[in-house]
Amino acid sequence: MSMSDPIADMLTRIRNAQVVQKTSVAMPSSKVKIAIANVLKDEGYIEDYAVTEAAGKAELKIGLKYYAGRPVIERLERVSRPGLRVYKGKDDIPNVMNGLGVAIVSTPKGVMTDRKARATGVGGEVICYVA
């Protein structure tokens, strides 16, 4: 059976792995998941990520980051989902925790943070909140 929301699965795997203090987590890979992992790395929420070939299928491995024994990612929340897509214009992109967190947005110019989307002047689909 196919997965109905692979991005929500990715976020859940990251949350669950951090609860049990795993150093890394592996999942099936896709272009959107790689783009999200790239944003998380650029913002300092994860150590690193790598795409490997396992049993003929691409696999995304994410190295998780901790500070003083606690996960760096405190909140990882899916916003737009298959049953209810959430699109925001450039002026309506939300601030997460008054700018302390990040909203990951899928725009016509690629997947980026809310700050970069506002600076670029584009809106798009709000994928998730990270704090």
From Swiss-Prot:
Q: Which GO terms describe its biological process?
A: translation
Q: Which residues form the signal peptide?
A: none
Per its UniProt record, what InterPro entries does this chain match? Ribosomal_uS8, Ribosomal_uS8_CS, Ribosomal_uS8_sf
- Keywords, comma-separated and alphabetical: Ribonucleoprotein, Ribosomal protein, RNA-binding, rRNA-binding
| Gene3D superfamilies linked | 3.30.1370.30, 3.30.1490.10
Q: Can you list the GO cellular component terms from the UniProt entry?
A: ribonucleoprotein complex; ribosome
Q: Which GO terms describe its molecular function?
A: rRNA binding; structural constituent of ribosome
| Family membership noted in the UniProt record | Belongs to the universal ribosomal protein uS8 family.
Role: One of the primary rRNA binding proteins, it binds directly to 16S rRNA central domain where it helps coordinate assembly of the platform of the 30S subunit.
Q: HAMAP family, per this entry?
A: Ribosomal_uS8_B (MF_01302_B)
PANTHER family recorded for this chain? Answer: 40S RIBOSOMAL PROTEIN S15A
The annotated subunit structure for this chain is: Part of the 30S ribosomal subunit. Contacts proteins S5 and S12.
What protein name does the entry list?
Small ribosomal subunit protein uS8
Which taxonomic lineage is given here? Bacteria, Pseudomonadati, Pseudomonadota, Betaproteobacteria, Burkholderiales
